[in-house]
Amino acid sequence: MEAPAAEPPVRGCGPQPAPAPAPAPERKKSHRAPSPARPKDVAGWSLAKGRRGPGPGSAVACSAAFSSRPDKKGRAVAPGARGAGVRVAGVRTGVRAKGRPRSGAGPRPPPPPPSLTDSSSEVSDCASEEARLLGLELALSSDAESAAGGPAGVRTGQPAQPAPSAQQPPRPPASPDEPSVAASSVGSSRLPLSASLAFSDLTEEMLDCGPSGLVRELEELRSENDYLKDEIEELRAEMLEMRDVYMEEDVYQLQELRQQLDQASKTCRILQYRLRKAERRSLRAAQTGQVDGELIRGLEQDVKVSKDISMRLHKELEVVEKKRARLEEENEELRQRLIETELAKQVLQTELERPREHSLKKRGTRSLGKADKKTLVQEDSADLKCQLHFAKEESALMCKKLTKLAKENDSMKEELLKYRSLYGDLDSALSAEELADAPHSRETELKVHLKLVEEEANLLSRRIVELEVENRGLRAEMDDMKDHGGGCGGPEARLAFSALGGGECGESLAELRRHLQFVEEEAELLRRSSAELEDQNKLLLNELAKFRSEHELDVALSEDSCSVLSEPSQEELAAAKLQIGELSGKVKKLQYENRVLLSNLQRCDLASCQSTRPMLETDAEAGDSAQCVPAPLGETHESHAVRLCRAREAEVLPGLREQAALVSKAIDVLVADANGFTAGLRLCLDNECADFRLHEAPDNSEGPRDTKLIHAILVRLSVLQQELNAFTRKADAVLGCSVKEQQESFSSLPPLGSQGLSKEILLAKDLGSDFQPPDFRDLPEWEPRIREAFRTGDLDSKPDPSRSFRPYRAEDNDSYASEIKELQLVLAEAHDSLRGLQEQLSQERQLRKEEADNFNQKMVQLKEDQQRALLRREFELQSLSLQRRLEQKFWSQEKNMLVQESQQFKHNFLLLFMKLRWFLKRWRQGKVLPSEGDDFLEVNSMKELYLLMEEEEINAQHSDNKACTGDSWTQNTPNEYIKTLADMKVTLKELCWLLRDERRGLTELQQQFAKAKATWETERAELKGHTSQMELKTGKGAGERAGPDWKAALQREREEQQHLLAESYSAVMELTRQLQISERNWSQEKLQLVERLQGEKQQVEQQVKELQNRLSQLQKAADPWVLKHSELEKQDNSWKETRSEKIHDKEAVSEVELGGNGLKRTKSVSSMSEFESLLDCSPYLAGGDARGKKLPNNPAFGFVSSEPGDPEKDTKEKPGLSSRDCNHLGALACQDPPGRQMQRSYTAPDKTGIRVYYSPPVARRLGVPVVHDKEGKIIIEPGFLFTTAKPKESAEADGLAESSYGRWLCNFSRQRLDGGSAGSPSAAGPGFPAALHDFEMSGNMSDDMKEITNCVRQAMRSGSLERKVKSTSSQTVGLASVGTQTIRTVSVGLQTDPPRSSLHGKAWSPRSSSLVSVRSKQISSSLDKVHSRIERPCCSPKYGSPKLQRRSVSKLDSSKDRSLWNLHQGKQNGSAWARSTTTRDSPVLRNINDGLSSLFSVVEHSGSTESVWKLGMSETRAKPEPPKYGIVQEFFRNVCGRAPSPTSSAGEEGTKKPEPLSPASYHQPEGVARILNKKAAKLGSSEEVRLTMLPQVGKDGVLRDGDGAVVLPNEDAVCDCSTQSLTSCFARSSRSAIRHSPSKCRLHPSESSWGGEERALPPSE
């Protein structure tokens, strides 16, 4: 168990078996408690175990946590703690510890291993058990500790503290046997535990003295037992308090949940009330038939509100669920801790039993007097066991309470699940995807929607029923109207009213027709509205089917996953199905009632109109069809009468025709006699005599009855007339014929039957096609009835013809009544048969309707199922599309992040790669990185890295591709990064090789140093012995005469010599290292040049083949006799071009080889014609198209790279030579003035007698000067002589400079040493070894060069070295006097350095320039001291040894930066410029005795040179820049007319407007120019100031930086070489701090963009 965090750490004293883990933080959830039984994160939950350690030593020490009995003051902790919240046990323990400091207890024991018990009430068990066992431990461990001397950590290691009694002063323990009582706490009122233990050890020794010791010890043990009981009670109270607090918090949470549940039920009741209200509204709307838009909108708003409320409830439920999960985690954690405490208890029990057994063994050997003590101990242990038993009982009670709480927790979980299943599990914080996929949320939504749709469907079904009832009522009214119309418009009425005239009848018919039309229109409108309602109902049923299918599928899906949720949903589904079944039953019941009402209505119609239309059915009887119009019936009756007349005329004899006429006349008379009854007839028609029966007795003499009877008779008489005609015809046939005639009469009955039945057929047609088969099926049953009726009519109507011939009289009324009765009987029989037929028809119709209803219900159910499936599928598609959209959004975000990370990684990788290359290049060139302490590979640390990035070829390609096409950029990026990876691998391999070489060199150096040190030690020992012998020989007096001054001088001189030796040795090491670097670079360049030679050979061969092919084609194509001369000229020219190109390739290869390796080779040119041929075949001069075209691919155009590469790769990698820039240059070349075109002169002045020393390798080693030909192409001049004053920082130049000058210096010092003459150090320019080459006679020198070199060496050996020259360095100054049209003088001299004051206004410090290389910075610190010593007089030949001076000179001259060592010079009167220019007609070696004042001079007469010399001086002062052209090339540019004389003449430079920048100046990216502009000291002067000041700045007009260094004023840090004169180009650049580095010159773009080491560092601001 972890100790409380609040207890002070002073308590640790005993040995600690294992480090205890960090105690859990003491914190309490402000809103809720984790669990009532197992609180989370309480540091001191099982308090008893935290205070004892497992070992026997620490058991005593750590049990002292119980020993200190608290004061009452210290006991009263934080009175507001109970009100503030849960009082954490660990905090309480800490407060107690502060109130009463405990004894020096041991450290907290480690957490014991977990036991496997799960009871949460073991805490009190542990506490009480420990309290009992502690008392036992006190007695048992006393002997062990007294025998073993006690634990060392407890007794001997404790500082002295006051004893509990505090009377005597504290004292340290005297011996290990006497334990320290000072470990007890000061504030304790009783003896603490550790003190009592120690005291028991003391009293054990004194047991033999008497029983008083036993009594005292017994009292101590009892007091300890009482204290431990109090402690256990306190712990028990704390535990109860903690449990109550947690129980209270859980009760509060339960109340809160119940309140939330009540709130939710309240909202549900409100929603139910609103739902009922909406149902009532919808019912009202269904009854009125109006669709209320406001109501629908209100319902939608209510649905939205309910949805929001349900979402909020879901969110709250989710919060509750999270809390429950957190509680589960806390419970689990507390279970684990309980297991750990159980294990700790077991371990402590074993640890307690060990000392008990040990003490029992010891006490067995003791005296019998100790047996009483053992009994006391056993009694105490029995007491402790009782207490332990009580604690176990309490723990059992706690276990029961815990199980009860667990059950409550489970029940709460079940309630939560029910709540969630009822109200869904929707959380607004969920994403849309989870929202779509959450089963609970969809289920609840669908339930709500399903209820709404079901309610709406119920309302609509009710509305449909109401509409059907209303529709049937309207149809009944319409049928009545049609009946009235049919009664008026039938043939019987026409027959009845034909005698009255048709005026009134026509008007009433028209009115009835209009009314019928109006009723039909209204019926059509009703049909449309019912169709619309049916469509709406179908749509709603579709929606309901969709939701039902969705709901059923959800239930089916959720049955597998969550069966708890699917049960209530299944119950709801079953309830919904039952409700639907009840509704369908109600609908069927209503339909049945509707049918019953229809049948009653039909019967009523039949009864009312029986007398009117016996053979016809009313439209109401015909069913619900509104299309049944009875108008065609009258027309069929009329046609039937016509047909009957025609048949009678054709068939009956004239007698029979007369009888028929008589009968018809009689009927007409009867109708005519009924004139008085018309008003009654109308009244009958208006009153709709529905209750009249024909078979009633006609004796009633009442008016209405008579009128009805007469009306019925008159209506039926017309029908009877036709039937009597046919009957008399058949009766005459029967009476007047034999059996054969009877058969004929019977055969003529079928037409009669058909005639009678034609009405039935017409009726069947009117009834509709649905009931045709049963109508025709009953036809055979009718025939015998009709025959019987006719037979009876035949018998009774025999006397009719005799009576009908008589006129009507009043006395014949009785006979009429008897006839009418007979007719009524006949009609009654017909009506009975008609009723039977109607009953059969109604039964058939009802059966058909039931079948149709069943079929419709099945169809509706199928449609509902289909709509459900469709809705389900639509929901699934929507959820899938939503999920897909979310996934697409997520993946697009991931993709964007990945793209950004990959771009950042590529960017960083590219920067790292460039940094590695930069570092590798500088290492190869021998430059040391600045030791700034930072990691040089750190990407963001150096600002120059972005400059490197802009130079890098990949960035250039990026910009080109972005400018040209974006598609190519996206396609080429993977290839570029693959290429970058490959380059990175190569660079790392090279770095590994270099590191390996460096390691090997380091080991060799260490070996050399070890050997040298050993030899030096031996020499030193020998010299010491020698000096001691010499001192003994010379004796003491000589030593005294020497004095201390001599020794001090010797000491100083020795120190200086040691210092100089170390510096010279470091310089020698640097030179050897650079020599190795240059040799390695040369070997790489050799391979590169061999590859280039092969490539150029292949190109030349290919061009030769192309030219031969062209020539052969031209020869074949052209006419030989017309174009012979031009052909010959073309052939001659092409062959001349190929020849010159071959010569040029050979020369170029040799030049590059010699230039790359730095071999000092000079070539004699015998004549000007030979030199001209060399110039002709040069690819860098104008005159060859092929040369101009091949230029961008020519590797010689770029800088000499230290890494091998083919020309194609160079053109791809170097941004200086991209195709876009070449096009740009070609476009800008059109703006060149025509004066820039080079004119070729084939007349070289061979008679001048000038000896030309041609040295091509310098052109490639020291930065190729660039001019432009007439086409704007960049060309590089090959003709350089030795004096090229441009301090290139390329690796080859540095290596060659150091190595060649080092060799020359060694030879020169050796010669001086042999000569023995000590001269002042006058040497050639230290930065100029490339111009000097070797002063040895190399084998490949020409005779002239050997002669000149010999002269120089003689001069150096001569007495010129005797001169005391205070200037320690000299310079080569190349000077060209430029005339406008005359021949010019070119003078090159190696002269001593003029005084600094003559060129600059003030002297400048050696460290003023920051534009030096990094390597020279490191060397400068050591060599500054050397120079300061050299300036002292002791370094002159009078005071110092020549060896010292030689070493200092070699150290000085080996530095790379010439400007460093042009330090504070002595005041020297006279100018080197004056010496070199006053005697212009001097011979070649006139000033050779002045100390290399002129290496050689090429002199010619000129008329205007003085002003040019002055101009050259001023330009040199103002802007010292390296030469643009070589000496030979300058000479032939000016003499032979090759140069653009107007633009490059220096005489006109000051007055004319300066030329625009060369096209190559636009080649670099603008970003590089801006960065260079920022880094170049942010100079104040603009381009115009620079251009105007160049020819005119004098001594004081030179711009200087803070240290006095001359700073070139510029805008873009780019010099325009085309505007410089030759004199300024030949000036010494090292006089200026800003040298003409390739980064300043736009004419060397490839060097400035790639040479990271060649870029000058920014000047110090």
Curated annotation (Swiss-Prot):
What residue spans carry the region label Disordered?
A: 1-187, 353-373, 1196-1221, 1432-1456, 1538-1563, 1636-1661
Pfam families in UniProt = SOGA, SOGA1-2-like_CC
Q: Where is the composition biased (Low complexity)?
A: 76-94, 133-149
Stretches of Pro residues bias are at 167-176
Tell me which stretches of the chain form a coiled coil.
Answer: 218-281, 310-351, 450-484, 820-865, 1083-1117
Q: Which segments show compositional bias classed as Basic and acidic residues?
A: 1206-1215, 1652-1661
Modification after translation: Proteolytically cleaved in primary hepatocytes into a C-terminal 80 kDa form. Proteolytically cleaved into a C-terminal SOGA 25 kDa form that is detected in plasma. Phosphorylated during mitosis in a CDK1-dependent manner.
Tell me what turns on expression of this protein: Up-regulated in the plasma by adiponectin in healthy fasting female.
Q: Where in the cell is it found?
A: Cytoplasm, Cytoskeleton; Golgi apparatus membrane; Midbody
Residues with PTM Phosphoserine: 1169, 1255
Name the UniProt key words of this record, in alphabetical order: Cell cycle, Cell division, Coiled coil, Cytoplasm, Cytoskeleton, Golgi apparatus, Membrane, Mitosis, Phosphoprotein, Secreted
This protein's superkingdom?
Eukaryota
Q: Which residues form the signal peptide?
A: none
Q: Where is this region: Required for association with Golgi apparatus membrane?
A: 211-240
**GO cellular component annotations of the record:** extracellular exosome; extracellular space; Golgi membrane; microtubule; midbody
Provide the site residues for: Cleavage.
Answer: 926-927
What biological-process terms (Gene Ontology) are attached? cell division; chromosome segregation; insulin receptor signaling pathway; negative regulation of gluconeogenesis; regulation of autophagy
**Predominant location category:** cytoplasm
Quaternary structure annotation from Swiss-Prot or TrEMBL: Interacts with CLASP1 and CLASP2. The C-terminal 25 kDa form occurs as a monomer.
Q: What is known of its domains?
A: Associates with the Golgi membrane through the N-terminal coiled-coil region and directly binds microtubules through the C-terminal domain.
Question: What PANTHER family has UniProt attached to this entry?
Answer: GIRDIN (PTHR15742), PROTEIN SOGA1 (PTHR15742:SF1)
User: Hey, which family's this protein in?
Assistant: Belongs to the MTCL family.
Q: What biological function has been recorded for the protein in this entry? A: Microtubule-associated factor that enables integration of the centrosomal and Golgi-associated microtubules on the Golgi membrane, supporting directional migration. Preferentially acts on the perinuclear microtubules accumulated around the Golgi. Associates with the Golgi membrane through the N-terminal coiled-coil region and directly binds microtubules through the C-terminal domain. Required for faithful chromosome segregation during mitosis. Regulates autophagy by playing a role in the reduction of glucose production in an adiponectin- and insulin-dependent manner.
- Its protein name is Microtubule cross-linking factor 2
